UniProtKB/Swiss-Prot annotation:
Family: Belongs to the TRAFAC class translation factor GTPase superfamily. Classic translation factor GTPase family. IF-2 subfamily.
Residue ranges constituting the tr-type G domain according to the UniProt record: 300-468
Region of interest: G5: 445-447
Annotated protein name in UniProt: Translation initiation factor IF-2
Binding positions (GTP): 309-316, 355-359, 409-412
């Protein structure tokens, strides 16, 4: 076996049928072993990774030791053993009998027309052969005699007892398989003798055996594990009142019911274990890599700090003061919508900050920020005190087991009482150092900058006292995706935080279901960088798709390996989503529910500009409690503009499309209007949650309907010192009216909203309206960020009574 596998050493990734040939078995047997190992191949021609081949060979040897021995017995060829053994001279009657038997079907090797002499007499052995031709010549039978002097007839009969078993040919074929087959049949008959009959089919007893399945597994996967037909399991499910197909992903509860009925126990592998096994199959073992790091390889890395706190308590303003920048104006209503990561210098050291949203709705994003952080800075306003989000942020920091530094903000405002904040925090077991505890409290003013330097010093002191922050910068990079979005002109852009190793331009990375080669990296200031050491946040370009916030990223050696890991992760995630969204309706109450109209479902499609916002909105909607009569199903979510395929999916499933800071393209807009699909747009997440909750409960007030007046495409951009930026536009649909509300759209994403058409000109004349098919100059007030190809959409807000 080992020789066969090594013989293909020049092939980097052998095919499954080649491995089966080396092991002396068939591809179907190896495919079954691969499924038990958690590896899934499509066909015998699928290529296997070298680690998978080694594991497969080991598993095959353990499961089929008899086949391995059989392979070893058949290795030496028969002709090498038999050729030097010449038979002894036989009596004359036996030779004549062999000659007479030639016409009855024995092979005649003496009929080769290209041989120097018929019968190949030149190969005859000297000695006895010189007398035998004389005897045959008298009988006129020279050629057959020479033929059978070389290969005597009794030789095949003597070969069998010498070897003890049939040679690999026509003689003795099938002796061993027949015995194995009969044993298999006997074992199956014995097992099926007492097997229970459920739903008209017979299923072998499980006797409590544990079957490990991945999330989103199907009936076919379960059937292959226990070696039964999927149709039999479907019959059992039907008998239990469950309707399913062989390839449909089932949830854990359904598998537990099915397994209990037939005597098995099902264990659903957790996503972390599943992903760990997937990486190990590609020779990527993260735990082993960390264990291999010696003390000499480790270097001090900067601390990673997460700023947490209640909404509008000054988290982003504090970070802006530290960075000496202003990102607050870019957020809707002054509320942080997206996660940002930045690194600042404090003397000769660095500190990495992660700015998490302060909403309760963004619980998942904030919790994910706590998982990658070393120190949590809890911002509490001195005038407001402790709020619900403050307690929530404190719980996340404690669950992540990270030290806490409390920043008492807004001490410059009237009514500020920092001492009261310290007293309130003691009620939650956060004891200040002034009271004999171990938590540092720093009074600051993010607006004036007072106490910010002291806060940075407190962060470094806490890191030095409570933590040992070291990492190996000389290995391949590992880290976490902080945020990701689809950027116009750049494609998928992800903000990643390197946790160990060094990330370099050109590395092949895998993060979640996305993969690619790092084409470029920029820091928080937009400057290009060639490498990122541990605790360094950078924006990465070159990914195939938009990963999720919180996905871990790794660097692999080959593009093919990165693609295979991402594709397997995507398939596993798709199966898990199908299992989660599957509605389990029993046969007993299915008809009754349809007749009474109790089963009602609201299907939704969510599209957003960044993955973190989409995930947070989805999680918030899943927590809505609207009773048992109405259910909420999110059938699709994604990042980017609303496309025509989204509208088509909404048409088929009668779904509502929610756009968070994104707009539909022209085809999607026309299709939605033609099909009557409800498409709603939001820029603040709480507005979307409130509307959907009220619509589910039937408590919506008369809605404010947004009517589209016109759409213009920017063809040229002009700059005027008197008016400002003028967009030379072509009106594509409707009409553009002066003083109308407008928004600026770029690549399907709303860049600026709440605009007003302040000036409208056609040639040199001021006009009040320009209709479709004409060109005009449009001024949008103080908005200067206008580019060629942008869309200017004018709208009108009207009240619409609800039906």
């Amino acid at each position: 076996m080992g020789v066969g596998l090594c013989g293909r050493g020049i092939v980097a990734k052998p095919r499954l049928y080649e491995v089966a040939s080396d092991l002396g078995t068939d591809s179907k047997t190896l495919m079954g072993i691969l499924r038990e190992m958690g590896e899934f191949v499509k066909s015998p021609s699928s290529a296997l990774e070298p680690p998978v081949v080694r594991k497969l060979a080991k598993a095959f040897a353990e499961k089929y030791p008899d086949k391995v021995e059989e392979k070893k017995e058949h290795t030496p060829p028969a002709p090498v053993v038999e050729t030097p053994k010449a038979p002894p001279p036989l009596p004359r009657p036996i030779i004549r009998h062999a000659v007479r038997g030639v016409p009855s079907g024995a092979p005649r090797p003496g009929n080769n027309p290209y041989a120097p002499r018929q019968g190949m007499g030149q190969l005859a052995t000297p000695g006895p052969a010189t007398k035998r031709p004389v005897k045959f010549k008298a009988e006129g039978d020279k050629k057959p005699a020479s033929t059978h002097r070389r290969v005597p007839a009794p030789l095949p009969q003597k070969r069998t007892p010498l070897r003890g078993r049939g040679a690999p040919g026509a003689f003795g074929r099938g002796n061993k398989p027949k015995s194995r087959k009969s044993k298999t049949l006997k074992r199956q008959e014995f097992e099926m003798r007492d097997a229970p009959v459920i739903g008209g089919v017979t299923i072998p007893r499980g006797d409590g055996r544990v079957i490990r399945l991945m999330q989103g597994a199907s009936v076919t996967d379960f059937a292959e594990k226990i070696d039964v037909l999927p149709a039999n399991l479907l019959s059992v499910l039907f008998h239990l009142g469950e309707m399913a197909t062989a390839t449909e992903s089932l949830d854990e509860a359904t598998f537990e019911i099915l397994a209990e009925e037939i005597g098995y126990k099902v264990q659903i592998v957790s996503p972390d274990d599943e992903d760990r096994a997937l990486l190990e199959s590609f020779s990527v073992n993260l735990a082993a890599e960390h264990a291999e790091d010696s003390e000499l390889d480790l270097a001090i890395r900067p601390p990673v700090v997460t700023i947490m706190g209640h909404v509008d308590h000054g988290k982003t303003l504090l970070l802006d003061t530290i960075r000496n920048t202003n990102t607050l104006a870019e957020e809707s209503g002054g509320i942080t919508q997206h996660i940002g990561a930045y690194q600042v210098s404090v003397g000769d050291r660095f500190v990495t900050f992660i700015d998490t949203p302060g909403h309760e709705a963004f619980t998942a994003m904030r919790a994910r920020g706590a998982k990658v952080t070393d120190i949590a800075v809890l911002v509490v306003a001195a005038d407001d005190g402790i709020m619900p989000q403050t307690i929530e942020a404190l719980d996340h920091a404690r669950s992540a087991d990270v030290p806490i530094v409390v920043a008492v903000n807004k001490i410059d405002k009237e009514g500020a009482n920092p001492a009261k904040i310290r007293q309130q925090m003691t009620e939650f077991d956060v004891i200040p150092e002034e009271y004999g505890g171990d938590v540092m409290f720093i009074d600051i003013s993010a607006k004036t900058g007072q106490g910010v330097d002291a806060l940075l010093e407190a962060i470094l002191l806490t890191a030095d006292a409570a933590l040992e922050l070291r990492a190996n910068p000389d290995r391949t990079a590992r880290g976490v995706t902080i945020e990701a979005k689809l950027d116009a002109g750049r494609g998928a852009v992800a903000t990643v935080l390197v946790q160990s190793g060094t990330l370099r331009v050109g590395d092949r990375v895998v993060t979640g279901c996305a993969y690619g080669r790092v084409r470029a990296m920029v820091d928080e200031n937009g400057l290009p960088v060639e490498s990122a050491p541990p605790s360094r946040p950078v924006r990465v370009q070159g990914l195939s798709s938009v990963p999720k916030a919180g996905d871990s990223f790794i660097v692999v050696a080959e593009d093919r390996q990165a693609r295979q890991i991402a594709e397997k992760r995507e398939a596993n995630e798709r199966n898990a989503q199908l299992a989660k969204s599957r509605k389990r309706v029993s046969l007993e109450d299915f008809t009754r529910a349809i007749q009474e109209g109790r089963v009602q479902s609201l299907n939704m499609i969510i599209k957003g500009d960044v993955s973190g916002a989409v995930e947070a909105l989805e999680e918030s909607l899943s927590k809505l409690d609207v009773g048992e009569e109405v259910s909420l199903r999110i059938i699709h979510r994604g990042v980017g503009a609303i496309t025509e395929s989204d509208v088509n999916l909404a048409t088929v499933d009668n779904a509502v499309v929610i756009g968070f800071n994104v707009r539909p393209d022209r085809k999607a807009r026309d299709r939605a209007a033609r099909e009557g699909v409800d498409v709603r747009f939001y820029s603040v997440i709480y507005d979307a949650i409130e509307d959907i909750e009220k619509s589910l409960k039937g408590l919506l007030k008369p809605e404010l309907e947004e009517r589209k007046l016109g759409l213009a495409i920017v063809k040229e951009v002009f700059h005027s010192s008197r008016v400002g930026t003028i967009a030379g536009c072509s009106v594509e649909s409707g009409s553009i009216t002066r003083n109308a509300k407008a928004r600026l759209i770029r690549d399907g994403v709303v860049v600026v909203s709440d605009l007003t058409v302040t000036s409208l000109r056609r040639f040199k004349d001021d006009v009040t309206e320009v209709k479709s098919g004409f060109e005009c100059g449009v001024g949008l007030g103080s908005c200067d960020d206008i580019r060629i190809g942008d869309e200017i959409e004018t709208i009108q807000i009207v009240e619409k009574p609800r039906a």
